[in-house]
Amino acid sequence: MSNVLLSPNGYVFASPKPLGRFINSKSGGRKLFFSVVRASSDDADCNAEECAPEKEVGTVSMEWLAGEKTKVVGTFPPRKPRGWTGYVEKDTAGQTNVYSIEPAVYVAESAISSGTAGSSADGAENTAAIVAGIALIAVAAASSILLQVGKDAPTRPKAVDYSGPSLSYYINKFKPSEIVQPSTPSVTEAPPVAELETSLPETPSVAQQETSLPETMASEAQPEASSVPTTSSTS
């Protein structure tokens, strides 16, 4: 069996004899033949500086969009032969990493779409035609509604001339008669203050009664005094 040394870019095949015998042997007459086979490097898998994407770090590349001449219909993310897609990022060691996060592009097969992947302006003609058709239908519907409303509009009634009496005649006719009440004379009553003032001059009569009391008492005392001497004389 032969010993095999693996390298990142190729394979190294030693001589048919074991490698240990070559190291331990002291004879210098033997010759060793080494054959180096380098593996083919794919451009899409290389990580060298010349193959690194020339993209701005921290942004998402937009090369996953459909090309102008793409003829594939449906969900298909077209890409160029050496296109770099995804999120470009550099790590702390300075190595550029590309993450494949591109979304799938869907080409709708409808009347608005052009039916093929490409720029968004390809289906603008169909979109404009559909919008114009919808606008014409809306205008026709609005005009028909206005015509129907104009036909069904009610006619205005004709004015009739009035030949009867005026309104003031009926107002005076049905106006109720006014009720006249006779005026009653107002009775004036003397205020009580005047009665008090008229009763004040009568108060001197009380003083006259008081002055008459001593006179009556004196007149009563005189007959008693006159009666006493008469009794003594008779005795």
UniProtKB/Swiss-Prot annotation:
Leader sequence residues: none
Membrane association type: Single-pass membrane protein
Description of how the protein assembles with itself and partners: Interacts with psbA, psbB, psbC and psbD.
Protein name as annotated: Protein MAINTENANCE OF PSII UNDER HIGH LIGHT 1
Gene Ontology CC terms: chloroplast; chloroplast thylakoid membrane; plasma membrane; thylakoid
Keywords: Chloroplast, Membrane, Plastid, Stress response, Thylakoid, Transmembrane, Transmembrane helix
Biased composition (Polar residues): 200-214, 224-235
Region annotation (Disordered) ranges: 181-235
Coiled coil: none
Subcellular localization: Plastid, Chloroplast thylakoid membrane
Record flagged with keyword Cell membrane: no
Membrane-spanning parts: 127-147
Source species of the chain: Arabidopsis thaliana (Mouse-ear cress)
Function: Interacts with photosystem II (PSII) core complexes and participates in the maintenance of normal PSII activity under photoinhibitory stress. May protect against photodamage or stabilize PSII under high-light stress. Participates in the maintainance of proper PSII function under high-light stress by protecting PSII from photooxidative damage.
InterPro entries given in the database record: MPH1
GO BP: regulation of protein complex stability
Disrupted gene: phenotype observed: Altered photosystem II (PSII) function under high-irradiance light. Elevated photodamage to PSII reaction center proteins after high-light treatment.
